[in-house]
A protein has these predicted regions:
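Active-site activation/catalytic loop segments of kinase-like enzymes and analogous catalytic loops
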Residues: 104-133, 145-164, 178
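An alpha-helical support segment within catalytic cores of ATP-dependent transferases
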Residues: 16-76, 86
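All-alpha amphipathic helical-bundle segments outside canonical DNA-binding/catalytic cores
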Residues: 23-28, 133-144
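Pre-DFG segment of protein kinase catalytic domains
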Residues: 73, 91-94
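Conserved kinase catalytic-core helix
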Residues: 1-24
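Conserved protein kinase catalytic/activation segment
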Residues: 82-91
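ATP/Mg2+ or Mg2+-diphosphate-binding catalytic cores
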Residues: 43, 50, 153-189
Length: 189
Protein backbone atom coordinates (compact mmCIF):
# COMPACT_ATOMS: atom_id res chain seq x y z
CA UNK A 1 0.00 0.00 0.00
CA UNK A 2 2.70 2.51 0.96
CA UNK A 3 4.84 1.50 -2.01
CA UNK A 4 2.01 2.37 -4.40
CA UNK A 5 1.59 5.74 -2.67
CA UNK A 6 5.33 6.40 -2.88
CA UNK A 7 5.46 5.53 -6.58
CA UNK A 8 2.49 7.84 -7.22
CA UNK A 9 4.26 10.63 -5.34
CA UNK A 10 7.50 10.12 -7.28
CA UNK A 11 5.62 10.09 -10.60
CA UNK A 12 3.62 13.20 -9.70
CA UNK A 13 6.77 14.98 -8.54
CA UNK A 14 8.61 14.11 -11.76
CA UNK A 15 5.72 15.26 -13.92
CA UNK A 16 4.63 18.38 -12.07
CA UNK A 17 7.39 19.96 -9.98
CA UNK A 18 8.89 21.82 -12.94
CA UNK A 19 5.90 24.15 -13.17
CA UNK A 20 6.68 25.48 -9.68
CA UNK A 21 10.37 26.18 -10.29
CA UNK A 22 11.49 29.44 -11.87
CA UNK A 23 15.28 29.25 -11.61
CA UNK A 24 17.82 27.18 -13.54
CA UNK A 25 18.13 23.57 -12.39
CA UNK A 26 21.36 21.58 -12.42
CA UNK A 27 21.64 18.08 -13.80
CA UNK A 28 22.51 15.24 -11.45
CA UNK A 29 24.07 12.87 -13.96
CA UNK A 30 25.05 9.78 -11.94
CA UNK A 31 27.71 8.66 -14.41
CA UNK A 32 29.58 11.93 -13.93
CA UNK A 33 28.93 11.90 -10.19
CA UNK A 34 30.42 8.40 -9.94
CA UNK A 35 33.42 9.39 -12.06
CA UNK A 36 33.95 12.42 -9.84
CA UNK A 37 33.86 10.29 -6.69
CA UNK A 38 36.37 7.86 -8.24
CA UNK A 39 38.73 10.69 -9.19
CA UNK A 40 38.58 12.02 -5.66
CA UNK A 41 39.22 8.58 -4.18
CA UNK A 42 42.25 8.17 -6.46
CA UNK A 43 43.72 11.58 -5.69
CA UNK A 44 43.17 11.17 -1.95
CA UNK A 45 44.66 7.69 -1.64
CA UNK A 46 41.55 5.77 -0.70
CA UNK A 47 42.02 2.33 0.85
CA UNK A 48 39.68 1.15 -1.93
CA UNK A 49 42.04 2.07 -4.81
CA UNK A 50 42.26 -1.56 -5.95
CA UNK A 51 38.51 -1.62 -6.66
CA UNK A 52 38.37 1.54 -8.76
CA UNK A 53 39.59 0.17 -12.11
CA UNK A 54 36.85 -2.47 -12.10
CA UNK A 55 34.24 0.09 -11.02
CA UNK A 56 35.29 2.39 -13.89
CA UNK A 57 34.95 -0.45 -16.38
CA UNK A 58 31.51 -1.32 -15.02
CA UNK A 59 30.47 2.33 -15.12
CA UNK A 60 31.20 2.48 -18.86
CA UNK A 61 29.30 -0.72 -19.61
CA UNK A 62 26.33 0.40 -17.54
CA UNK A 63 26.18 3.79 -19.24
CA UNK A 64 26.07 2.08 -22.64
CA UNK A 65 23.31 -0.24 -21.39
CA UNK A 66 21.24 2.65 -20.07
CA UNK A 67 20.88 4.13 -23.54
CA UNK A 68 18.98 7.31 -24.32
CA UNK A 69 17.01 8.76 -21.42
CA UNK A 70 14.21 11.22 -20.79
CA UNK A 71 14.94 13.90 -18.20
CA UNK A 72 12.78 14.82 -15.23
CA UNK A 73 13.54 16.80 -12.10
CA UNK A 74 14.53 13.99 -9.79
CA UNK A 75 15.08 13.72 -6.06
CA UNK A 76 18.12 11.47 -6.61
CA UNK A 77 18.36 10.21 -3.01
CA UNK A 78 15.28 8.09 -2.32
CA UNK A 79 16.32 6.50 0.95
CA UNK A 80 13.49 5.52 3.30
CA UNK A 81 14.57 8.33 5.66
CA UNK A 82 13.85 10.88 2.91
CA UNK A 83 10.19 9.86 2.58
CA UNK A 84 7.96 11.12 5.40
CA UNK A 85 4.37 10.11 6.06
CA UNK A 86 2.43 12.59 8.21
CA UNK A 87 -0.60 10.30 8.29
CA UNK A 88 -2.37 12.21 5.54
CA UNK A 89 0.23 12.57 2.84
CA UNK A 90 3.75 11.59 1.89
CA UNK A 91 6.59 14.09 1.60
CA UNK A 92 9.93 13.85 -0.19
CA UNK A 93 12.51 15.66 1.94
CA UNK A 94 16.23 16.32 1.76
CA UNK A 95 16.60 17.62 -1.80
CA UNK A 96 20.34 18.39 -1.75
CA UNK A 97 20.88 16.01 -4.70
CA UNK A 98 17.80 17.19 -6.60
CA UNK A 99 18.21 17.99 -10.29
CA UNK A 100 17.52 16.79 -13.81
CA UNK A 101 18.03 13.06 -14.24
CA UNK A 102 16.34 10.05 -15.75
CA UNK A 103 13.29 8.86 -13.79
CA UNK A 104 14.93 5.43 -13.77
CA UNK A 105 17.52 6.72 -11.28
CA UNK A 106 14.89 7.62 -8.68
CA UNK A 107 13.05 4.35 -9.27
CA UNK A 108 16.29 2.36 -9.05
CA UNK A 109 17.29 4.22 -5.90
CA UNK A 110 13.90 3.56 -4.36
CA UNK A 111 14.23 -0.16 -5.08
CA UNK A 112 17.91 -0.57 -4.31
CA UNK A 113 17.88 1.44 -1.08
CA UNK A 114 14.72 -0.17 0.25
CA UNK A 115 15.13 -3.84 -0.66
CA UNK A 116 12.25 -4.24 -3.11
CA UNK A 117 11.63 -7.71 -4.51
CA UNK A 118 11.77 -8.34 -8.25
CA UNK A 119 7.97 -8.51 -8.36
CA UNK A 120 7.71 -5.18 -6.54
CA UNK A 121 10.21 -3.65 -8.97
CA UNK A 122 8.21 -4.88 -11.95
CA UNK A 123 4.99 -3.55 -10.45
CA UNK A 124 6.72 -0.24 -9.70
CA UNK A 125 7.79 0.15 -13.34
CA UNK A 126 4.30 -0.69 -14.61
CA UNK A 127 2.66 1.74 -12.20
CA UNK A 128 5.10 4.55 -12.96
CA UNK A 129 5.12 4.21 -16.76
CA UNK A 130 1.63 2.74 -17.20
CA UNK A 131 3.17 0.23 -19.60
CA UNK A 132 4.64 -3.26 -19.39
CA UNK A 133 7.70 -3.43 -17.11
CA UNK A 134 9.75 -5.47 -19.59
CA UNK A 135 10.20 -2.46 -21.90
CA UNK A 136 12.25 -0.75 -19.18
CA UNK A 137 13.84 -3.73 -17.44
CA UNK A 138 17.37 -3.66 -18.90
CA UNK A 139 17.98 0.12 -18.63
CA UNK A 140 16.32 0.10 -15.21
CA UNK A 141 18.60 -2.69 -13.99
CA UNK A 142 21.62 -0.79 -15.33
CA UNK A 143 20.48 2.32 -13.48
CA UNK A 144 19.95 0.27 -10.32
CA UNK A 145 23.61 -0.73 -10.49
CA UNK A 146 24.59 2.91 -11.06
CA UNK A 147 22.53 4.01 -8.07
CA UNK A 148 24.15 1.40 -5.84
CA UNK A 149 27.56 2.35 -7.20
CA UNK A 150 26.92 5.99 -6.32
CA UNK A 151 25.94 5.07 -2.76
CA UNK A 152 29.03 2.85 -2.47
CA UNK A 153 31.40 5.54 -3.76
CA UNK A 154 29.78 8.18 -1.57
CA UNK A 155 30.39 5.92 1.42
CA UNK A 156 34.03 5.40 0.40
CA UNK A 157 34.54 9.17 0.24
CA UNK A 158 32.75 9.54 3.58
CA UNK A 159 35.17 7.03 5.12
CA UNK A 160 37.93 9.57 4.43
CA UNK A 161 36.20 12.86 5.19
CA UNK A 162 33.09 12.50 7.31
CA UNK A 163 33.27 13.65 10.90
CA UNK A 164 29.96 11.98 11.73
CA UNK A 165 30.26 9.02 14.08
CA UNK A 166 29.11 6.26 11.78
CA UNK A 167 30.73 3.05 10.56
CA UNK A 168 31.21 4.04 6.93
CA UNK A 169 33.55 1.07 6.43
CA UNK A 170 30.72 -1.34 7.23
CA UNK A 171 28.31 0.70 5.11
CA UNK A 172 30.76 0.57 2.19
CA UNK A 173 31.07 -3.22 2.58
CA UNK A 174 27.30 -3.61 2.68
CA UNK A 175 26.88 -1.49 -0.44
CA UNK A 176 29.70 -3.26 -2.29
CA UNK A 177 27.90 -6.53 -1.63
CA UNK A 178 24.58 -5.12 -2.86
CA UNK A 179 26.30 -3.66 -5.92
CA UNK A 180 28.00 -6.98 -6.76
CA UNK A 181 24.65 -8.79 -6.53
CA UNK A 182 22.95 -6.18 -8.71
CA UNK A 183 25.69 -6.40 -11.35
CA UNK A 184 25.40 -10.19 -11.42
CA UNK A 185 21.63 -9.87 -11.88
CA UNK A 186 22.14 -7.30 -14.62
CA UNK A 187 24.60 -9.53 -16.48
CA UNK A 188 21.98 -12.29 -16.61
CA UNK A 189 19.47 -10.14 -18.51
Amino acid sequence: KNLMRIISLVAKTHREIGQYLNTPILTFWPFQVNQSYMSRLESDGSPHMSKLADLKRQLELLQDATGQVDLVIGHNDLLAANILDDGDQLWLIDWEYGGFNTPLFDLAGLAGNNGLSILQEQQMLEQYFDRSWDIYWRPYQAMKCISLMRETLWSMVSEIYSEIEFDYGAYTSENLSRLSSAILEFQQI
